[in-house]
Amino acid sequence: LKTQIQEGADCDLFISAAPTQMNALDGSLIGDTEKNPDGLDLIVTDSRVDLLENKVTLTVPEGNPKGIESFDQLAELLKNGDVMLAIGNSDVPVGQYTLKIFNYYGIDETAVANKLTYGNNVKEVTSQVSEGAVDCGIIYATDAHSANLTVVDSATAEMCGQVIYPAAVLKGDKEDAAQDFLAYLQTDAAMTVFESVGFSAA
């Protein structure tokens, strides 16, 4: 989504699955080449809020054929080459959180590459798990919920940090309407809907 916005896609409000993508559009961070490497100034900085929190989960196909129960067990299975795991590419947030989990367990991605399959986004990873093409996958709690997948473990903040979804209004001719909608998304009524699909308030 960040790339589409950067390339000029029509967008009034952006909710990102990680701060990294929002930072790259935030003009208040121009000069910080790590956070905003292209010097973009596309969001209304004052509108930016941390809207939601998600969890990074370990999910399994129906029946859990490998009997996977935890990230601890997954780490051992990966090191022994005894599991097929679906993960997101390193340029998407779910993949970035996964690499933090690998780092936490001292797993070298290249050393276990033959036991990994990749998705260009979290939906592709979810599909691989749903179809039983892999033994397990690392996806968000919300995606597991919508696909009716079994979650066997959730990553802690220590393992991969918190999964915060920032939201911000994009600069343009619809800033007032987008700001009103963003305010609505922070109400109790909206949060009830978010919580029903696996999110929590940030």
Positions of predicted regions on the chain:
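Exported/periplasmic ABC-transporter solute-binding proteins
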Residues: 2-6, 18-19, 25-27, 52-54, ...
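Active-site acidic carboxylates
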Residues: 44-51
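Early extracytoplasmic/lumenal segment of secretory-pathway proteins
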Residues: 1-36, 42-44
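GST-like domain detector, emphasizing the conserved glutathione-binding G-site
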Residues: 36-39, 48, 65
